[in-house]
Structures are given as C-alpha cells and as structure tokens.
Amino acid sequence: MSGPASAPFGHHPWLTRRPEWTALEDHRAQGIPHPRLRELFETDPERARRYRVRAGDLLIDYSKHLINDETLALLQELATATDVFGLRDAMFRGERVNTTENRAVLHTALRAPRDAVIEVDGENVVPAVHEVLDRMADFAGRVRSGEWTGHTGRRIRTVVNIGIGGSDLGPAMAYEALRAFTDRDLTVRFVSNVDGADLHEALRDLDPAETLFIVASKTFTTIETITNATSARSWLLAGLGAQGRTGEQGRTGDEAEDKAVAKHFVALSTNAEKVADFGIDTANMFEFWDWVGGRYSYDSAIGLSLMIAIGPDRFREMLDGFHVIDEHFRTAPPESNAPLLMGLLGIWYGNFHDAQSHAVLPYSHYLSRFTAYLQQLDMESNGKSVDRDGRPVEWQTGPVVWGTPGTNGQHAYYQLIHQGTKLIPADFIGFARPVADLSEDLKAQHDLLMANFFAQTQALAFGKTAEEVRAEGVPEEQVAPRTFRGNHPTTTILAPELTPSVLGQLVALYEHKVFVQGAVWNIDSFDQWGVELGKVLAKRVEPALSEGADVPGLDPSTAALVADYRELKLREVK
C-alpha cells in the first residue's frame, strides 16, 4: 500500500561530505586523473568484452569511458550509500516518491501486464490502466477502419494532436520513430506552440471534414493547448458550415456545433466538466492519473494519436518493450544494471569531471526527435537546485542534453566534440538493420551510415597522435591542427532494428537513468516548479500586451520591453 514517504526519503547526510563521494574525488585527483583510453585497452585485452551489458534487445557498450574497475566500484558504493535501490523499490511499490507534490510515480504501471498488482492508496491501478488501453484500442480501430467518420460521413484522413510538453513531445517523437509502422492512409500532425503559426501551418492544407483533433490536457485548462483547441474548433466549424449534411448546411447554433465537434474532437483529460463545456462527448474522453507525470506519459492515453497511427497491436508491443527494461532495472544486479550504470557514468562526468552537457546522437533518421524528447525527460526532471530536504544543493545536477541524428551532426558540431576544449560525454545509438520499409538500394546505404557510427566513437576515443599525422607526410606546421587527442567518452547502444518494442526499451532505459541520477543527487525528479512559475507570470503579462493594461510588479526591464512591443505592434497596424 502506498503512503507518505518514509525512511528512504528522510533527512540525508550532505552528499559531498559522504565518504563515498570524497573517495571518488580522491580517485579522480590521484588514481585516475587523465586515463588514456589507448592505454586502458592495451593493458586490458578483455576490456571491450567486460565493459558491456545487455538489457532486452539493447547492447550497451561502455568500454570507451574514462573509468577502470575501481571507478565502477566506487560509483556503485555511492549508489548504495544514497539508497538508489531503496528509492527504486519504493517507486515500483507506488510510494509517494514525488515528495513536493506528495504523489506516487507509477509510469511503470502503464506498461504492466494485466495480471500485475500495483497499488496506490490500497487500490490496484492496473485494471484501470488496461480499461483505458482497451477503450483506446477500440477507438483507434474504429478510426483506422473507417467506421468512425466525421460529421459529414467522410473518413478521417488526418489526426491533429494538440498538446504541449509531455502531451506533445512524447507522441510526436514516437510517431516519427515508428513512421515505418504507420498506416500510410492516415497522417498525424502535432500542434503545441501557442504561436498561431504552428496551428496555421498544421491546418493550411487539411479538409475539416476529414480531420480529427485530439486535445491533450490533464486539467483541460493548459492555456497553450486550450487556446489552440479553441482556434481549431473555430476553423472546423467554419469549414463545415459550407459542407454540412444535407438539410443542415449553414445551420448555426449550439446543437449543430456540438454535433460537429463531437465527431471531430476527442479529449485526453481528467476534467469531464471542462471537456463537456468544450463540446466534446465525454464518452470520447480518455483519462490518465496524477501518478503519471507529463514527461512520462506518452505510453498512457496521451499516446492515442500514436496508437491510431501504428495500431493497437504495435502500441502494445511498445508497452512490452518498456516493461522489459522496467523489469531489468528492478531486478538486474548492480554490475549489469544498464540504467544504473548509465546514470552513474553521467554523475562521474558531471560531478567529478565538470562536464556541463551530454550529447545523444542517434544514427537513425527516424529518431530525429528523440533527443528533443530526452531534453524534457532529463532537464525537466533533474534541472533542480534544491534537494529533497529543501536545502540548496552545492553540487552539479542535471546536464544540458542535446544532439541530432548522425550523420548530420558530423558536418555541424562534431568538430567541437573532437577538438574543442569541453568534455562532452556522448551516447551513440545505432541499429544493425534498417527498417524493412526501405527499398533494397536504400537498405544498402545502411552500412555506410553505420560505418560512420563506429568510426566516430573510435576517433573520439583514440584520436590521432602527432606521430601518426607525421607518418602521413603532413608538413610540420600542419601537424598540431591535424592532431586529435581523443579520450572523449562515449556509450554505444546497439539494437537489431528500430521496432515498437525497441523504442519502448530505449525510452525506459533513459527514464530509469534519469531516476538514478536524481536519487544520488537527492532531488525530486518528478516535479517541475520552474515550468509553473513561467505560466503564472505569462498570465499576468498578457493583458499588458493585448490591452495595454498596467501590470503591477513588472521589473523596469520587462516593463520597458512591453512598452516597446506595444509601440511596434500599433505602428505596424497603422
């Protein structure tokens, strides 16, 4: 039974005063200050075999890191001392590990099998999860088959997901990742930005009669989402006004509008009253729960657009992939626990090597939005400066996460990683086979893609010495610019193919990595008060922009900028 946080979440000794922390500082300063990866491999012929783990379909190679066996042992001791495993078990049990909001954190329940028992406040939540999944599957099947039609009786051809944050980044990332598995007769578009241009571009070539909107907002009060949804409703009604059913053409009034809206809008929310006020039939409202954080939610009802695109069976394959890594994280011993190892390696660089960022570099065009998704997952979770006890931390927490798909990045910012002055640990994600959808000619390009994949990690690790440059006959004045010191740490994640299951495994791997780091840093990885502050201030400032109203409490800089904005806005109108 879940309940208020107890022993694992009580007062913690100051992290940097722990003997396990100071042992790592000493190790960094004395034992392994500047390990050369060339030397580490030369002195340990088994290093490549020993420094790798398997989790589900994922092979994770961490041999190209600035570590030795002692480093790993010390990091494991830090994990034990900070009770990472106790926190992990408490999360899986449904305890309220989100301490600032007093909530359970159970995104793992979203992919639990039907016969699992996971309790929140004494109630098994798994049946409710599967009830929603079954309703989603029924609705998705009706849209995909053409049984569900729009107000005029025409088949739905485009689904527009309106959400923001976790209600957009997750499903948008997964839709791109699994595009090879989508129904090509259906298109899904995503609208998130309150900038009207986002909605305009999404709708400009669509037929309202063939468009279905999914409005994703837990409270149905998210300002960006409801603003866009209201504009989308106006667009729909205006478009259908000239093409309604026979006998209804040009009809106006709430009843006619409600009929149209009910056939073209569904909601992902828990606020039935607000959903009904909007005109959406609450029978087409799919709920989720307060123990699911937005950035962990695309495998809940938030993923309805994805389920419509790839079908319920593929969606369940993805959930099964999540569950594989959940179980791995929950049960694998520390020395072979992939999320634990990845999390601890990040701490090694962020806290003991002063690395400020972390690059995630997928060698797959389909993962073009994967790093953007991880930015929210990691930076919103661990971008904190106060610990669980309310004290300002005095150690680095979450890194800046960035990256784009290879090989594009090689012709942009890899230069800085190779020869710049910053230490940037990087994850390289690749696949042994291209997706089956490709023609044989295009499949043949996959080996070239992966040749770059392996070459980059080798070059980053081992570089190119001045002697090797001279051996090529390079003039002496050109030797220094063409020398690569190497020693840039990378993790290689290799899977057979990008499938729904493998995508679920990848996302769960990073979810639990983020959890591990938050546990060590003693921060709450599941709130996001920085996001909330911005929302409050935006509501205060908006009347000054739209109406010219005085807003008390604006600082002089912002007040002056608001006045400039108003002047420029009015000048253009004239």
PLM features per residue range, with description:
Residues 20, 33, 47, 67-74, ...:
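General structural feature for long, well-ordered alpha-helical segments within catalytic domains
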Residues 49-50, 169-172, 199-200, 223-225, ...:
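Short helix/loop capping segments that flank catalytic or ligand/cofactor-binding pockets
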Residues 484-488, 492-521, 526, 533, ...:
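C-terminal accessory domains/tails appended to large, multi-domain proteins
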Residues 238-245, 254-438, 463, 486, ...:
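Active-site phosphate/pyrophosphate-binding segments
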Residues 138-146, 152-332:
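Glycine-rich phosphate-binding loops that contact phosphosugars or nucleotide phosphates
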Residues 9-152, 444-473, 517, 553-557, ...:
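Extended, charge-enriched "interface" segments that sit outside catalytic cores
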Residues 157-163, 213-219, 357-364, 400-401, ...:
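Short glycine-rich or small-residue beta-strand-to-loop segments that form or flank ligand, phosphate
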Residues 174-179, 204-208, 229-232, 282-283, ...:
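Short, solvent-exposed amphipathic alpha-helical segments in soluble enzyme
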